[in-house]
Each structure stands twice: as structure tokens, then as C-alpha cells.
């Protein structure tokens, strides 16, 4: 190093001192070289080229000047023809010489000089090394023919009257017009102009042909009839239109030859132009063209972005979107990258839709296509994912990119996005409204297990209907069900409302009860003016404010309602079976609702968390007064309200102290420490103090911690909830959370078994290992052994989730084939099992629990067709599986996103009802079942008052189950067995026939294969009967009778029992005969106050948040959580 340093000479002192003062600037200035760029554009030629060609605005001006110059030359030619007076005679000299005045000649010479100079200049600027390419161009040749003779006449005066075919400048004007339009489109940045250009070219070609023909014939007939311009125009029009009257005809052979030549040119040129125009028109029809900017600025439109458009999706969107009166004038622009299929094209040609729906083929990722759709002027943009894709994650990624592209192009356009998988939701948090399909689906299926038909309830609420479905039906339940299906959620400010204005300063429950009693509306929630959070049933301690926004359920919104007082209504004498608007209550309802006599304190005490108790007063009080209901207080009395603190689990009061102690040691309440994906809403749940080892989560495999290998061995106190899914996706987490929410009583927690086709990953197991009684098993519903091991014989509900791998099929609606057949097998094998099925296509609901010869199902099918013909959005609602809540399709919830355009609160309310979101002070959805002890309440109005006065619950509907009045054809068919009843008397014979009818299900076929084989065996035994005697013959006869009486259901039951015995499972408790085939269930949303309460009715309730009444609710939530892994564990959350 010393040698190297010694080789570098030291700097002189002056440089060192200067560097100290000035730094390195001196050295940099000495080494700098000034470089000028784009020197090639500074030449004279390049400057001219920039002005005449490259610059868009200056080039456009040059083109416009050139076009005007050509038109002027044609105009001067017409003036010359009109001014001349040709001498009489037929000399050929009239063809070559014309009369041209001096001023006209001067103008034509000037125009020719300018045109020739401009043409030569542009040829020089566009010269690329081949001079002949510039000279032999047709525009250049025409310019030479029309300009050079005039320039020569300047130097040779005798040639001033020489004929020059100046009318050919029309073709140069056409060429200049095309260039001008191209420059104009470049200047205004318009690229989608092919159709306009082609139409312009066609029109200009026609005009040039006609103008050339007119001028040519007029000039050539100077030696003949001497036609004027008007006669020439008349002849050309008649000739080109193929009419040919013959009153004006050319006489000279030259003019005739010219006409033939022009017709030949027209036959060659025009078909080419028409062919190009037709091709562009067809392409335009495929791509959809452009949405007019003028219309976008003067009219309102929304854009629907989809990857592929199916007819079902289109009709769902159009029917729901245009169901609202204020949206009738909106246009819908569909932006889709694929071509329209035949069905969509046919629908969009219907006048009702063709005037309001515009289909554009394009991609949301292209700014040009977004510009075509005028996305920046749109009122909203709906972006839908394609759910019928094998790779749903890829479909979500496309949706995310579309949302990003729209937000980048039009940041002020409201976004309504549908996403499939919950782990992708956080990518589009910026969207105004987001519906995650799997979140809603699993939460809805979970609530179906504890609140029956929740999926049907939500589906009816988010569909727009007038409640006119089923009103033409002869059956009363269909009229009631159809009328109540028209109820929707609406909102209004309290001080502006006729329904709720009088309840300012009063409690929420008081307002809800009296509004329902007086107007028939169900107040379900409120929102403060200065708060964005919606509170469902905030409870009796919430005081209504004048600026509160009230959310209520009704047939129509208040603004569209008319009000009549009681006297007017009595005079009208209109008998209504349903209450909508003010109605006269029955006498017993009015007396009961007065609340003049209060019931005892124990009747207003807190219910058990398992459900409200509509118990009668005590025996002592019955002797004094009849049952009555306490009034709903205007302002809650703190001393009289006993809150249902579910944190202490009052539902467990019936348990022994030892059981209660063990239960408290086993469970805790808190927020789940792990979430399988980012963006899941934290929910207060029942949790374990310590997470379960992964090996213990496997239901059918023993481990070192337990030795159980089937569901029966665990000895669960409550029935199972089984979920059959293909994979343990992140959305399945939302199935578990609502069933383990903190407000669910511990005694009523059902064990959850996940029957998965594929093993779950570790992240999912990390999330579910903290929840009590959650297990999984690898198996399939195709395998009977797997079903028996997971405990299907004593399960309360079986949820069959649609498989992603079967969601797409080549034939429409065939995606559900495997699911439908598997569920039908379950339905046959386990008739007592409540099966809840998810389908891809709602149209396939008619195949659920299919019975080919069921007359009642056939009648419902006809009713569905009639409702569809009437234009109903809910034609499928009368299908018994849907009405009972046993089938669901996620596509039914697409209307939730569409309805949010008008009701921006619908997604929030639905998430609160399903338990996907929890807001402090907001209630939750639950249900209670009416028993025989509760029938004293009699009417829905009294039930409403009882719940509001006791615990603050708000009922919103009834799930009713009735016996099926119309028996099926199969249940009426029975085969007489009298010919085999030789050994029995008539009483036993009738007894056996009755048993046979009862044991035969309504869905079996007339002659099942198994029973046919059994009968054949019995006949063979009967033929061999004479060979036996005594007890042997009697035994054979008895076997023969028993075999015949066995129904298909009994055959299947025996098959199941044999498999259970083979697997070592106990057959105790297997009930093969208890089914629900002879009943029908349906929902009554917000029924009238005088609706009778019936036995086994299930009432939907919105129960107040029990934590809202605790003094320190938030600390209690946080402190009650078990000691689990801290924030570091969240870093392992799967993205």
C-alpha cells in the first residue's frame, strides 16, 4: 500500500485551496459538454414535415384548406357550365373547347397553382427514396391533369378556353376529406371510428360517382341534345336506381360509352364498399359500439362488468334493478369480454330491454373499453365474479383487477363488487359495497341449523316483490306465504315519518310494538345521525331521537302508503285476510293489548337463554284474574328490567353445581385468537381454555388423548350438525363462528362435524382448534360407511355444500347433477334427517326430494310457471324445499348487491342478521318454538307485546309447519293383500293393511324392485307350501306375508342397520320411519297482528345484545377471553 500511495503525485497547493473554497465545480465545468437533442428536427424539411404532417392541429388545418380548395374548383366548374351558351351545331370542337370568361379563368388558374404547389410540396415531404411511387399515385396524376393545362394557358393565351375535366377534383376532395377525418380523430384522441369512416367513404364515393356522371354526360352531350345539369342529374338518378324511364337518354356514342363505363365502375366499387361496411357492422354488433357521451352526460347509466354473461344472471340483475320505480330511466351498459350468446341476444332484442340495455364487448382492464362505456360518467359499476369456474381463486383475481382498473380510471364511480373467497376481500376494501359469497353462504347455512329456513327468510327480504305471488292460488297457505314475501326492509328519518314520529323520546321496544299494532310495520333497527353503525333492536333502554334513521319491514315504504283512520276503514267494509296498513284487530287482541292488568313479576323476569317462556301466571294468580300481558313501557324502568346476561349462562341454572363447575372450567368466552384469513370480523365466541391438539380434531381416528373412532362413542348430549364439503376453505370458518357465538347457550351448542373430501390444511386447523366440539373427518357423502361413522343417524342437520369441482358443466344446469343425486340418496336412506342443500342453479330446486308421481308437486310446478308468466322475481318460492329452507342457491343473494344501489344499508343489515358483523349494542337473530304451554298467547300481536314487555325481543316472522292437505297419488295406492290372508281374520287383515299404508312413504315407486323380488320369493314359497305341514307351513306363510308388507323404506332401513352392525356401530336410536314428507313448511315475514299462533310455530326474534346492559361491557369482553397466543400468532395468518 505504501508503494501505491507513493506513485500518486500530490496536487498543487493552488488546486487544493480552490477545491476547499469551491469544491469540485471547477473540475466539473472543465469536463462538461453541452449536448443538443433532436437535431434532426431542426432542418428545414423536418420543420415543414412537422407543420404539414406530424403536428395534428396544423395538419388538420392544411387538410381542411385542401378540401375547401377542391370543392371550390368543382364549384367554379359548375358556374362555368351554367354561364356558357354553346353555339348550335354538332361539331366535335365543342368537346375540346368551351367558353370561359376571363375572371373565371383567373380564379381557376389561381386554384390550380395553389393545388399543384401543395401537392408537389407534400410529395417532397413524404418522399422516401422512390420518386416513381410519388408520381404514379392516382391523386398526383389527377392533380396534374386538372392543374397543368391552366398553368400552360398562362403562357399560351390561345389555350385559355381549352376544356379541362375539373369535375374530377371531386375525387381529390374525397381523398382530402378522408385524410382530414383521420387527422381530426387523432386530434381528439378518438380511435373507435372505423364504422364512421366506412360510412363516410361510402357516401362520398356515391356522391363522387354521381357528380362525375352528371358532369361527364352533360359535357359529352354538347354535340347532341345539349343537356343541362338538371337533366343530367335526373338521368343519372334514374339510371343508377335501375328504374330507367327512357324520357332522357344520351344520343352520342361517346356519352353512351361513358355511361357504360360509369356503371361498370359503380358495380366494382360500390359492392366492395358495402361489403366492408357490412363486415364492420357485424363486428360492431358483436362489440357493441360505444355508449354516447351526450347520453352519458344527459341520462343516467350504470355499468355491469362480468367475465361471462349468462341469461340467469342477466335476468336477475335486470328484474331486481328495474324493480325500483326511480330506476326506470336508467340505462344499463354491460361490459363483457365474450360475445353474446344466443339466449342473451334474444332477450336484449325484446323492446322492454333493447331500449335500456346496451351490450359492449370489451375488457374492464382496457381504458379504451372503459371510455366506450363512459365509466367516468356512470352512476355505479357492478363487478361480478364468475362462480361457475373450476378455479374460483383465479376468478377472484380477475375481479380484483377489474375493480382496480375501474378505480384507477374513474375514482369517483361507486363500486359494487362481488367476491367469491373471503381471503381476497381485503384487496377491494376501497369498494363502496362488497358481498363475499362464501361468507354469506356459510353463515346462512349455519343459521339454518338453529333458526330454520333462515336462508329463505333472507332471500325473500332481499328480493323486490309486491307480495302478489300466490294470490290466485286456492290454498290459503300459499296466499299468506306469497303476501308476506312482499315484505322488505326500508328506512326513514323518524321526524319525517308518520309511522314513528310520535315515538320520539320513547323506548325502541315501545316504538316497535305500537308501530306494528297501529300500522303493521316491524321496526327492527335504528341508526344515529352522527353514527355509521346500524343497531338491530338496541333494546328497551334505547331512546328514540328525532334525527334517528329507522329501519323497518313492510310491504312498501311509507312514502308510497296511504292512511285511513278506523272509522273510514269500517265504512269501507273491505275484508282483508292480511294486515297491511291500519286494520281493525279482533276484540280479544285489542283487550289484550291494552295491558290494563299486569302479570306477576315472574312473568316479566328474564327468560332462559334457550328461548323465551310465555308461561301463564302461577296457580294462585289464576284464581284471582285471567292471564294478561304487561304493557310495553314508554321509557324502560331500570329496576324492572332484568337483563339476560348470557355471559353467566342462566340457561344452565338447571344443571347441578358439579356440572356447572366443569362447564365453566371447560369453556370461556372471548375473541378467537386465530383467523384463517385477513379481514374476518372479530366475533365474541365460546372458546376453549386450551386449544385442542390436531389429532383430537379427527373424529374417526383415535389418538393418545382419546380412543373414540365414531361419533356415537363421544356420547354427545345434543344432536350433531354435519357439514359435507369438498375442501376446508376459509369460508367454512364462517359456518362455525355463528354456531359458537357468545349468545348461544352452552347447553344448546351442537357438535359440528366437517365431512371433507380432502384433508384440511394446518392454517384451518389452527383456527378451529379453539372452538368446542368441532371435529372433522375425511370422507364423502357418496360412501355410506363414511356417513355412518360421522354420526348421520343421530344428526339434527346435514348441510351439503356445493362442490367447486362440479360447479361448471358443459350443459346448462348440469353442474348440480351429482349433488342432487347424492342428496336424494340421503333422503331415501335417512328420511328423518333434516338435509340442507346448496345448489349452483336455483332452477334445479325442483329436483330436491323428487317424487315423480306426487300430484302436489305437479300442482306447485304449474303454479311456478304461472307466476313466472306474470313476471314474478320469486317464481321458485312455492317449491316446498325452498319454502321449508332445505335448499339454497348463492345466486339468490346476487340481488343483495343490486338492491344496495338503492338501499345502501342492506348489506350491513344482512351481515348483522347472519352474525358476520357484531356491533356493540346491536341485537342478533334467534328463534323460539311455540309449545302447547304457549298457546294461551293466541295472536301474533299479543306475542309481540309479551316479548317487548318482558325481555325486549322483537319478532320479525313465523316459520310454520302444516300437514300436507293434498295427499300424493302414491300414498293413495295400496295393494290389497286379501288373497294372502288365509290364516288371519278380518280384523287382523285391516290392521295389517293400515300398518302397510302407514309404513309406505309418499315418495316410493308403485312397485319397487326389492319388494318385487320379495313377492316373487313369497310366491315360490307358496308353491312349495303343500310339501310342508303344521308349524313349518305356518312359518313359511308368515314369512311370505312379512316380506310382502316390507316397503322400500324398510328395505333401505335394513340395509343401513346391516352396515352399522358391520362397522360395529350401535343401531339404537336409528329411526327409519320418522320423516317430514307429509308436512309443508313456509315463512310468514311480518304477519298481521291478528295472525293466530299455532302449535310448533317457530318465531324469528331479534334479541337485544346482552352485553349492552353490562356496566363495563367492553372490558368484560376483553377480560373474559382465555389466555391464548398473542399478536405474534396473527402473523401466520394465511393470505
Swiss-Prot record:
Homotetramer. Forms heteromeric channels with KCNT1; these heterodimer channels differ from the homomers in their unitary conductance, kinetic behavior, subcellular localization, and response to activation of protein kinase C. It is found in: Cell membrane. It comes from Homo sapiens. Are normally in a closed state unless activated by an increase in intracellular Na(+) and Cl(-). Inhibited upon stimulation of G-protein coupled receptors, such as CHRM1 and GRM1. There is conflicting data about the effect of ATP on KNCT2 channels activity. Intracellular ATP was initially report to inhibit the channel activity. However, others studies conclude that KNCT2 channels are not inhibited by intracellular ATP. GO terms for cellular component: plasma membrane. Residues 85-101, 159-164, 220-228, 250-256 are extracellular. This is Potassium channel subfamily T member 2. Residues 229-249 dip into the membrane without crossing it. Changing residue 190 to H: In DEE57; markedly increased outward rectifying current. Glycans are attached at residue 99. It is a multi-pass membrane protein.
